[in-house]
C-alpha cells in the first residue's frame, strides 16, 4: 500500500486489486501495475472478455426467446395470451425504468470521472508551475551574479589595486559569488538531467483524452435516454414502425453497453492496481524517462522526516557563502569606501545584488521544500484514485444496467409489436390492467373532460 502522507488506498481499490489476474493460458500473473508487460495486458484483456462472454449469453437468451415466441405463439389460448400481453407491456416499461435509473447513475459517474481527471491535470499544472519557477529563479539569480562578477567586482578590484588587503577581500567575494552561482546551477540541473521534466505536456495529453472520453459517454447516455423515451412513446401510441426501429437500435446499443462494460471493468482493475501502490510505479517511470536522482524523487514522493532533503548541503553552503559576502561587503563599506570614494557606487551595486540574491534564495528554499510538490502529487492521486475510481465504478454499473435493460427490451418489443397488429379489429383481447390500453386511455380522457 502507498505510504504517501495524506493518501491511503480506498477499500474498493483494495477489493479490485485482489481480483485474480489471469493470462490467456489461464495462468495467474502478478497484480502489480505493469501496463508495458504483455502478461499484464493479457490479464486486463481477459477481464474485459468477461463482458464479451456476458454478451454471448445475452444473445443466446434473446435467440432462444425469439424462437420460442415465433414457434409457440399460435398455441396460446385467449386467457394466456391476454395475461402475456400485460406482462410484456409491463416488462418493457420496467426495462425502460431500469435503463433510466442506469442513465442517471451514468451521468453521475461520468461527472465524477471528469472531476477526478480535472484534479489530476490541475495538480500537474501546479507542479509544472513550481518547477518552472525554480528554473527561472535559479537562472535569473545566476545571471545576476555573473553580471556582478564581470562588471562591478572587476571594477572594484581595479580601484583597490594599490591596496592588497582590499584586493584579497574582493577576490574572496568573487569566489563566494561564483560558489553560490555554481551551487544554484547544480540544484537546477537535478530537475533537468537528461530528458526535460515537463508535467504540463502530460497534463495536456490527459486533458485531451479526457475531453473525448467525456464526450463519448455523454453521447452514449443521450442515445440511451432517447431510445427509452421513444420506446415509451411507441408503446403508448402503439406505433408499429417505431417499435421495430427501437428494437433494432436497442440491439446495437446492447452491443455498445457490453463493450463499454468490458472496457470499464479492465480500466477499474488496472486503476486499482496502480492506486494500491502508486509510489513505486511513479518513481520507476519518472526516473526512467527523466533520469532524475532517485533520492530527489523519494524526497518529494514521501516527504517525511525519514527522508533527508537532498538539497540541504548545497543550500547550506550557499547560505554560508552569502553570509560571508555580506560580512566582506560590510568590511569594505566601513574601511575601503572612505579611502576610495569612487568605489562607493560599485559597492552599493554589489550590496543590492546581495539583497536580491538573498530574497531569491529564501524563495528558492521555499519552492524546493517537499510540501508543495508533494501536495500536488497527493492531490493528483486523490483525484485519480478517489473520484476517478468512483466514477468508473458508477459507469460500470450504468453499462451493466443498460445491457440488462436492452436485453429485456429486445426480447419484449417484438411481442409488443405483434400485439399491435390487430388492435383496430378487436379490443376484447386486451387486458383492462394494460397501462397502454387504447380504450382505457380514451375513457380516462372522457372522464377528465367531464370534470
Curated annotation (Swiss-Prot):
Subcellular locations according to the entry: Cell membrane
Stretches of the chain found on the membrane's Extracellular side: 1-43, 108-214, 262-390
Keyword set includes Membrane: yes
Reaction equation(s) it catalyzes: chloride(in) = chloride(out); L-glutamate(out) = L-glutamate(in)
Membrane topology summary: Multi-pass membrane protein
Its job: May act as a calcium-independent, swelling-dependent volume-regulated anion channel (VRAC-swell) which plays a pivotal role in the process of regulatory volume decrease (RVD) in the brain through the efflux of anions like chloride and organic osmolytes like glutamate.
Identification of the protein by name: Protein tweety homolog 1-B
Gene name, Swiss-Prot/TrEMBL: ttyh1-b
Amino acid at each position: 500500500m502507498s505510504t504517501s502522507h495524506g493518501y491511503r488506498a480506498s477499500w474498493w481499490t483494495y477489493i479490485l486489486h485482489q481480483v485474480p489476474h489471469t493470462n490467456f493460458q489461464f495462468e495467474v500473473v502478478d497484480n502489480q501495475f505493469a501496463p508495458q508487460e504483455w502478461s499484464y495486458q493479457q490479464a486486463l484483456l481477459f477481464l474485459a472478455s468477461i463482458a464479451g462472454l456476458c454478451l454471448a449469453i445475452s444473445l443466446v437468451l434473446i435467440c432462444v426467446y425469439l424462437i420460442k415466441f415465433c414457434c409457440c405463439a399460435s398455441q396460446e389460448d385467449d386467457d394466456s395470451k391476454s395475461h402475456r400481453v400485460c406482462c410484456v407491456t409491463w416488462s418493457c416499461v420496467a426495462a425502460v425504468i431500469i435503463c433510466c435509473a442506469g442513465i442517471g447513475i451514468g451521468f453521475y459517474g461520468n461527472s465524477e470521472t471528469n472531476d477526478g481527471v480535472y484534479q489530476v491535470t490541475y495538480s500537474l499544472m501546479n507542479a509544472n508551475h513550481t518547477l518552472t519557477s525554480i528554473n527561472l529563479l535559479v537562472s535569473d539569480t545566476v545571471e545576476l551574479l555573473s553580471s556582478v562578477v564581470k562588471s562591478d567586482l572587476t571594477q572594484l578590484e581595479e580601484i583597490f589595486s594599490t591596496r592588497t588587503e582590499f584586493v584579497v577581500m574582493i577576490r574572496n567575494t568573487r569566489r563566494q559569488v561564483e560558489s553560490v552561482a555554481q551551487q544554484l546551477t547544480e540544484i537546477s540541473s537535478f530537475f533537468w538531467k537528461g530528458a526535460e521534466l515537463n508535467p504540463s505536456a502530460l497534463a495536456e495529453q490527459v486533458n485531451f483524452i479526457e475531453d473525448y472520453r467525456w464526450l463519448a459517454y455523454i453521447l452514449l447516455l443521450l442515445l440511451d435516454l432517447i431510445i427509452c423515451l421513444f420506446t415509451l412513446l411507441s408503446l403508448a401510441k402503439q406505433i408499429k414502425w417505431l417499435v421495430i426501429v427501437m428494437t433494432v437500435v436497442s440491439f446495437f446499443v446492447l452491443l455498445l453497453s457490453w463493450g463499454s462494460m468490458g472496457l470499464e471493468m479492465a480500466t477499474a482493475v488496472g486503476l486499482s492496481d496502480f492506486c494500491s501502490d502508486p509510489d513505486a510505479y511513479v518513481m520507476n517511470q519518472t526516473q526512467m524517462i527523466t533520469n532524475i536522482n532517485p533520492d530527489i524523487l523519494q524526497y518529494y514522493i514521501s516527504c517525511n522526516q525519514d527522508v533527508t532533503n537532498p538539497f540541504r548541503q548545497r543550500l547550506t553552503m550557499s547560505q554560508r557563502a552569502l553570509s560571508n559576502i555580506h560580512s566582506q561587503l560590510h568590511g569594505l563599506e566601513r574601511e575601503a569606501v572612505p579611502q576610495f570614494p569612487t568605489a562607493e557606487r560599485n559597492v552599493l551595486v554589489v550590496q543590492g545584488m546581495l539583497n536580491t540574491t538573498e530574497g531569491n534564495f529564501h524563495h528558492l528554499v521555499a519552492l524546493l521544500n517537499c510540501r508543495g510538490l508533494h501536495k500536488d502529487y497527493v492531490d493528483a492521486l486523490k483525484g485519480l484514485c478517489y473520484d476517478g475510481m468512483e466514477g468508473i465504478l458508477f459507469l460500470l454499473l450504468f453499462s451493466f444496467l443498460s445491457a440488462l435493460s436492452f436485453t429485456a427490451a429486445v426480447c419484449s418489443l417484438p411481442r409488443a409489436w405483434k400485439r399491435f397488429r390487430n388492435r383496430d379489429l378487436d379490443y376484447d383481447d386486451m387486458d383492462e390492467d394494460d397501462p397502454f390500453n387504447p380504450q382505457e386511455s380514451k375513457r380516462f380522457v372522457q372522464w377528465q373532460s367531464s370534470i
